[in-house]
Design a protein with these regions (language model features):
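Extended, composition-driven regions rather than compact fold-specific motifs
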Residues: 1-298
Length: 298
C-alpha cells in the first residue's frame, strides 16, 4: 500500500514539474530582479561590513543569504566578487605577517611565548571576509549558502585563474569542514517510502548513470537493490552524497548485468554479494571534502 502511494506520488511530482528539471526563469522577470536587487545587495553588504552591533550584523547577514537564495546571477556575482576581494590580505596584514615571519621563537622558548606568537599569527591572517563569513554561515540557510558560494568561487577561480576567488574558496572550505561535523551527518536509506520530492531530486542529481524514467528509478530501488544518502540539517534535504547498491549472486562481470536492459534479479535470501556500483557527490561546493568516502565507510 505504501509503495503504491509512493509511486503514484512520485509520478505526480514528475508530471507537474517536468521530468527532471526546473522551469527556466522568465527573462523579463530575471531582468527586473537583477536591476532591483543589485543595488540592494551592495547596500546590505556595505552596511554589514560597517556595522559592529551584533544583532544588526545578524539581521543583515540573514538578508544577504536571502538575496543569494533568490538566484539572480548578477547579484550573486557581485556578492562573490565583494567577498573574494575581502578574502585577500591587505597591506597591514602583509606587514604583520612579514614581522611575524622574522620573529620565530628560539628553540626552547617558553610555551607562553610560542602560544602568544601563534595567537598573533592567527589574528594577522584573519581577513575582512572572515568575520562576514562567520555571520553568513550562522544565518538561517547559511550552510547551504556557504556550499553554493564555494561552488561559485571554485568555478571562477578555475575559469579566470582568479587569486581572490581561490582565497575565498579556502576560507569557505575551512568553515564547511567545521560545520559539516560527522556528528551532524545523517545516513538514510532511500526507498519507495522516501518522499517523492527527495527521490526526484536524487534522480535529477544522478549524472554518472542518468535515470530517464520512473521505471528506471523503480528498478534501482527494487528488493535486490538499495540506495543510501548522506544529509546535513543545514542543507534542508539536499543530499551530500549517495550510493547505489545491488545484491547479487557472485560478482557481475559487467555493469550491464545490474542496470542494463536485460539485468537480472536475485532473491535477497540467495544473494551473497553487495556491489557498490555507483557513488555520486553532487555538491560542487563540497569538492575535496571526502563525503563519498564517508558514505562507503558508513
Amino acid at each position: 500500500m505504501n509503495a503504491r502511494r509512493g509511486r503514484s506520488g512520485l509520478q505526480g511530482v514528475f508530471e507537474r514539474i517536468g521530468v527532471w528539471s526546473r522551469s527556466p526563469r522568465n527573462p523579463a522577470e530575471h531582468h527586473e530582479l537583477s536591476s532591483r536587487d543589485l543595488g540592494r545587495l551592495d547596500r546590505v553588504f556595505k552596511r554589514l561590513t560597517d556595522t559592529t552591533e551584533l544583532s544588526g550584523r545578524r539581521r543583515l547577514a540573514a538578508e544577504l543569504v536571502t538575496l543569494w537564495a533568490e538566484d539572480v546571477p548578477p547579484a550573486r556575482a557581485n556578492l562573490l566578487r565583494a567577498l573574494a576581494e575581502a578574502a585577500l590580505p591587505d597591506d597591514a596584514q602583509r606587514v604583520a605577517l612579514g614581522v611575524l615571519g622574522s620573529s620565530s621563537p628560539e628553540v626552547g622558548a617558553p610555551a607562553r611565548q610560542r602560544l602568544e606568537l601563534l595567537a598573533d599569527a592567527q589574528r594577522a591572517v584573519r581577513t575582512r571576509a572572515d568575520a562576514i563569513l562567520d555571520e553568513l554561515g550562522a544565518a538561517p540557510g547559511g550552510v547551504r549558502f556557504l556550499v553554493e558560494l564555494r561552488a561559485a568561487a571554485i568555478d571562477v577561480a578555475a575559469r579566470d585563474d582568479d587569486a581572490a576567488a581561490s582565497a575565498l574558496d579556502l576560507l569557505v572550505q575551512a568553515r564547511l569542514q567545521v560545520l559539516m561535523t560527522p556528528a551532524l551527518i545523517e545516513l538514510r536509506r532511500l526507498d519507495w517510502d522516501t518522499p517523492a520530492s527527495l527521490l526526484q531530486r536524487v534522480a535529477a542529481l544522478e549524472k554518472v548513470h542518468p535515470i530517464e524514467s520512473i521505471d528506471q528509478l523503480r528498478s534501482r530501488l527494487a528488493d535486490d537493490r538499495a540506495a543510501f544518502a548522506l544529509f546535513h540539517p543545514g542543507m534542508h534535504g539536499e543530499p551530500l552524497a549517495f550510493v547505489w547498491l545491488a545484491f547479487t549472486k557472485g560478482i557481475p562481470d559487467s555493469l550491464d548485468r545490474i542496470i542494463g536492459p536485460h539485468a537480472g534479479t536475485v532473491p535477497v535470501d540467495r544473494a551473497d554479494t553487495a556491489v557498490f556500483w555507483s557513488i555520486s557527490s553532487p555538491q560542487p561546493g563540497l569538492a575535496g571534502m571526502g563525503f563519498g568516502n564517508e558514505l562507503i565507510k558508513a
